[in-house]
Protein backbone atom coordinates (compact mmCIF):
# COMPACT_ATOMS: atom_id res chain seq x y z
CA UNK A 1 0.00 0.00 0.00
CA UNK A 2 1.38 3.40 -0.99
CA UNK A 3 1.83 6.11 1.61
CA UNK A 4 0.22 9.44 0.74
CA UNK A 5 3.09 11.76 1.65
CA UNK A 6 0.95 14.89 1.66
CA UNK A 7 -1.61 13.29 3.99
CA UNK A 8 1.15 11.95 6.26
CA UNK A 9 2.74 15.39 6.55
CA UNK A 10 -0.68 16.91 7.25
CA UNK A 11 -1.27 14.39 10.03
CA UNK A 12 2.16 15.08 11.55
CA UNK A 13 1.56 18.82 11.34
CA UNK A 14 -1.84 18.46 13.02
CA UNK A 15 -0.27 16.33 15.75
CA UNK A 16 2.39 18.92 16.50
CA UNK A 17 -0.23 21.69 16.52
CA UNK A 18 -2.29 19.63 18.97
CA UNK A 19 0.76 19.18 21.21
CA UNK A 20 1.37 22.93 21.20
CA UNK A 21 -2.26 23.66 22.04
CA UNK A 22 -2.46 21.10 24.85
CA UNK A 23 0.89 22.11 26.37
CA UNK A 24 0.33 25.81 25.71
CA UNK A 25 3.81 25.83 24.23
CA UNK A 26 5.31 27.56 21.21
CA UNK A 27 8.69 27.44 19.47
CA UNK A 28 11.36 29.31 21.41
CA UNK A 29 10.28 28.00 24.82
CA UNK A 30 12.96 25.27 25.06
CA UNK A 31 10.82 22.17 24.51
CA UNK A 32 10.40 19.29 22.06
CA UNK A 33 8.44 21.76 19.93
CA UNK A 34 11.70 23.52 19.03
CA UNK A 35 12.80 20.40 17.13
CA UNK A 36 9.44 19.23 15.80
CA UNK A 37 8.26 22.49 14.23
CA UNK A 38 11.31 23.05 11.97
CA UNK A 39 11.16 19.43 10.82
CA UNK A 40 7.47 19.66 10.02
CA UNK A 41 7.94 23.00 8.24
CA UNK A 42 10.52 21.43 5.91
CA UNK A 43 8.19 18.50 5.21
CA UNK A 44 5.22 20.79 4.60
CA UNK A 45 7.27 22.95 2.25
CA UNK A 46 8.51 20.05 0.14
CA UNK A 47 5.86 17.34 0.33
CA UNK A 48 3.99 18.27 -2.84
CA UNK A 49 7.15 18.43 -4.96
CA UNK A 50 8.60 15.19 -3.53
CA UNK A 51 5.40 13.11 -3.53
CA UNK A 52 5.69 9.98 -5.63
CA UNK A 53 9.45 10.29 -6.15
CA UNK A 54 11.22 7.96 -3.71
CA UNK A 55 14.58 9.70 -4.09
CA UNK A 56 13.06 13.15 -3.52
CA UNK A 57 11.10 11.86 -0.53
CA UNK A 58 14.31 10.45 1.05
CA UNK A 59 16.07 13.79 0.48
CA UNK A 60 13.13 15.63 2.02
CA UNK A 61 13.25 13.39 5.10
CA UNK A 62 16.99 14.04 5.47
CA UNK A 63 16.37 17.80 5.20
CA UNK A 64 13.62 17.58 7.82
CA UNK A 65 15.95 15.65 10.15
CA UNK A 66 18.63 18.31 9.70
CA UNK A 67 16.11 21.05 10.50
CA UNK A 68 14.96 19.20 13.62
CA UNK A 69 18.59 18.78 14.74
CA UNK A 70 19.24 22.50 14.24
CA UNK A 71 16.08 23.34 16.17
CA UNK A 72 17.19 21.09 19.01
CA UNK A 73 20.66 22.62 19.08
CA UNK A 74 19.13 26.11 19.20
CA UNK A 75 17.59 25.28 22.59
CA UNK A 76 21.05 25.70 24.16
CA UNK A 77 20.60 29.45 23.83
CA UNK A 78 17.03 29.50 25.14
CA UNK A 79 15.69 30.08 28.60
CA UNK A 80 13.32 27.36 29.82
CA UNK A 81 9.67 28.39 30.11
CA UNK A 82 8.05 25.07 31.09
CA UNK A 83 8.76 22.30 33.59
CA UNK A 84 11.25 22.13 36.42
CA UNK A 85 13.94 23.85 34.37
CA UNK A 86 11.77 26.99 34.32
CA UNK A 87 12.25 27.40 38.09
CA UNK A 88 15.89 28.26 37.41
CA UNK A 89 15.41 29.54 33.88
CA UNK A 90 18.67 31.50 33.71
CA UNK A 91 20.68 28.38 34.55
CA UNK A 92 18.99 26.54 31.69
CA UNK A 93 20.82 28.72 29.16
CA UNK A 94 23.69 26.74 27.66
CA UNK A 95 21.99 23.39 28.32
CA UNK A 96 20.45 21.34 25.54
CA UNK A 97 16.75 20.59 26.14
CA UNK A 98 16.12 16.86 26.58
CA UNK A 99 12.70 17.02 24.94
CA UNK A 100 14.18 18.64 21.86
CA UNK A 101 16.64 15.75 21.61
CA UNK A 102 13.67 13.37 21.47
CA UNK A 103 12.19 15.44 18.63
CA UNK A 104 15.51 15.31 16.79
CA UNK A 105 15.71 11.54 17.27
CA UNK A 106 12.19 11.04 15.90
CA UNK A 107 13.12 12.78 12.66
CA UNK A 108 16.53 11.10 12.50
CA UNK A 109 14.88 7.70 12.89
CA UNK A 110 12.37 8.36 10.14
CA UNK A 111 15.05 9.69 7.80
CA UNK A 112 17.38 6.75 8.39
CA UNK A 113 14.76 3.99 8.14
CA UNK A 114 15.73 1.52 5.43
CA UNK A 115 13.78 1.99 2.22
CA UNK A 116 12.58 -1.62 2.42
CA UNK A 117 10.58 -0.76 5.55
CA UNK A 118 8.42 1.51 3.43
CA UNK A 119 5.68 0.32 1.11
CA UNK A 120 6.60 -0.55 -2.48
CA UNK A 121 5.73 2.09 -5.06
Residue ranges and their predicted role:
Residues 1-121:
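N-terminal loops that bind phosphate or other acidic moieties
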